[in-house]
């Protein structure tokens, strides 16, 4: 039995019932022995395909008696992961949460247009040692990006993720940003890399967004060919969703794989988080072969 998990992506309308319906509609084809490559034509990119694709990888590893890491040709191991500080009304509260996450060397900060510089300044004072990533979640316009980016650079921010709304970021073409810009919502899969190039310097790969590990590997390879940096992220998921994403983390420049830490209950004996790193589970519940 192959195992996989799909959390879905809200802006793809990936509600649980919709994902279940997609899988049920394709059940006969899947059960007949569909390949991972054939699955790309059967299910659209999103959480449903992610779940099935990762289950097929797990099943393939069992049949081959080789781990997924071995099948892909990467060495299994831990990666540094960011810890996310959510947007709050009080910048001081955000700084306190960043300080409490002292074992994490990378802090990802959610921002909008309300006092972003004040928030980052407070967090920087609390965590002078941390590498700071800013995620605007499509919350600025081009003028705000131009206004805020230089000061964020001076405060030691490493890059800005998705500053402008998807479909409203054409102005980035030709813009020389003082900080690298990372496309999240603006890069769903490999088909959008040509548009991303020249506007962004990095992409955030999420398996729920691109539709599984197979698509994520293709997206990572395509991005590298274009000279783009790589980040891997996750939707809110258990360790079963993080296990395949960790493979992309081994290929990426940055990882944001803290999803299970935000849950009350995780997959039993899930991924191990220690010293700001995420380690493969010793229980080997996915991809072990």
Where are these regions (language model features)?
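Short phosphate-binding/catalytic loops that engage adenosine nucleotides
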Residues: 128, 157, 228
